[in-house]
């Protein structure tokens, strides 16, 4: 992370909290920001209303900059046959645990609605995982005063983020815990470790002036 990026983000320490969707809290994000790093809210599973509530909670606890992260994903719309087949496959597991099968009423949050909420909330940083924005979306965030950070697992993905206007790229290597954010090409092509991926991305993005952040 470069000193120019630190100045742009308004933080004293080169530390960005992992968004950790599902296990983060506004209190944690506020504490990290108050300590000189950049606190983050993982909003991939938050509704627009929940995003607004979480952002307000952070702002009540600190006046320091913080960021919000979204999953770039299409909202699934499986047909009835697919849902029924899945329920039948899961039925024995529910029975083994003595539970009644619960038919899903929602598959994930609607990204378009989340994105609109993000623009309206105007956090210092808007970051993204599992996909990529288009240039118009990045421009809307810039107009709202947000620094845009994209996640990349390959140099190809890092260059794609630079092409649409991202300010920084978070280079996430093979060691990423739990899941990968690969969105271009096959997962098997994204087997580079973070310590190797970071300098590769730095070299590739230097001509565009795009900063590189090493993922944890």
Role assignments for model-derived ranges:
Residues 1-209:
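Active-site entrance/lid segments in N-terminal catalytic domains of soluble metabolic enzymes
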Residues 209-216:
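Glycine-rich adenosine-cofactor-binding loop
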């Amino acid at each position: 992370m470069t000193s120019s990026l630190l100045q742009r983000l308004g933080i004293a320490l080169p530390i960005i909290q992992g968004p950790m969707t599902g296990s983060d809290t506004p209190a944690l994000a506020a504490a990290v920001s108050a300590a000189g790093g950049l606190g983050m809210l993982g909003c991939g599973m938050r509704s627009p209303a929940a995003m607004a509530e979480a952002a307000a909670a952070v702002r009540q606890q600190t006046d320091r900059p913080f960021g919000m992260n979204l999953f770039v994903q299409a909202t699934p719309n499986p047909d009835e046959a697919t849902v029924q087949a899945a329920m039948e496959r899961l039925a024995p597991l529910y029975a083994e645990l003595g539970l009644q099968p619960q038919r899903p009423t929602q598959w994930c949050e609607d990204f378009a609605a989340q994105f609109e909420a993000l623009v309206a909330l105007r956090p210092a940083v808007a970051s993204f995982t599992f996909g990529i924005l288009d240039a118009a979306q990045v421009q809307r965030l810039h107009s709202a005063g947000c620094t845009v950070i994209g996640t990349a697992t390959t140099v190809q993905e890092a260059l794609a983020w630079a092409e649409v206007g991202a300010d920084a790229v978070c280079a996430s290597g093979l060691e990423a815990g739990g899941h990968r954010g690969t969105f271009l090409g096959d997962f098997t092509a994204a087997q580079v470790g973070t310590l190797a991926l970071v300098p590769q991305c730095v070299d590739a993005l230097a001509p565009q002036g795009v900063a590189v952040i090493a993922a944890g």
